[in-house]
Amino acid sequence: MSPQSETAAPSPLETWPPQWSPSAVVLDCDGLLVDTEARWLALQEDYLSRHGAGLDPVARRALTGRPIEVVVAALAEAVGKDPHLAGAELLAEHEERMGGPLEPLPGVVDTVRAIAARRPLAVASNSPRDLLEGTLEGLGLADAFDTAISFDDVVAAKPAPDLYLAAAAALGAAPADCLAVEDSETGAQAALAAGMQLIAVPSIPGQEPVAPRRLDSLADPVLAEWIAGWEVRR
C-alpha cells in the first residue's frame, strides 16, 4: 500500500498491480497529460510579481487545479484590478505562452493509447472546452478519447464531483467501476467525491493528492503491465 491517507473503504488499488480492472477510465488533462499546469502557475506568479503582489503558500496550494475563473478572481483581488481586466490580461498571455508545441508528460501517449484500446476513456478537465480541445489536438490524442468533459459542461467544477459523474454517465459506467487518474489535490477530491477508484500522479511541487495509489509518472512499468492485462471491453 502506498503511503497515502486512509480512504473510507479498502481500495483494490492498495494492491499493486491490482486484481481489479475498471469498466471505464477518466483522466485529468492539465498537469497529468501535459505540463500546462506548471506553465499556468508560472504565469500567475509572473503576473503577481509584476504587480508587486503575491499569494501565501496556503492560498497558492488551494488554487492549484481550480477553474480559471476562480484563479482569476483571486489574482485580481491580490493585484487590486477588476476581474474582467485581469482575466483578459492573463488569458491573452496564457494563449501566447501556449502557442508553442505541446510535449506530453512521460508515459502519457503509451498509457492513453493502451487504455483506449481496451476500455471506454474520457477526459475531465476544469479547463474551458476550447482550451481542452486545443490541448488534446496539440498532443495528437483527441481521437483516443470517447468523450471530453470540460468546465463548460457542468454546474460545479472540481473539487465538486460533477465532471467525473458526467464523464461516467457519458461512458455508460457506474462511477464506482471507473478508474480516475489525477495530479492535483483539487482533482483528487473531485474523483473521490464521485466514488471512483483513484490513482494520483502529482507533477506540481507542494501538491499531495490523497489517493489509494500514487505513482511518480504514467511511465510506471507496473501500470503498463496492469493495463496490458485488461481484456478488451469496447
Set out the residue ranges of the language-model regions:
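Helix-loop "lid/cap" segments that line or gate small-molecule binding pockets
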Residues: 45-48, 67-81, 135, 168
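Short, acidic loop-to-helix structural element flanking the phosphoryl-transfer center
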Residues: 15-16, 21, 96-123, 129-133
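Active-site neighborhood of HAD-like aspartate-dependent phosphohydrolases
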Residues: 2-61
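Anion (oxyanion) recognition and catalysis
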Residues: 49, 115-116, 192
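Metal-dependent phosphoesterase signature
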Residues: 54, 73-110
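Conserved SAM-binding loop
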Residues: 33, 104, 121-124, 156, ...
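Asp-based, Mg2+/Mn2+-dependent phosphohydrolase catalytic module
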Residues: 1-23, 129-234
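Helix N-cap/coil-helix junction residues
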Residues: 53-55, 81, 141, 172-173
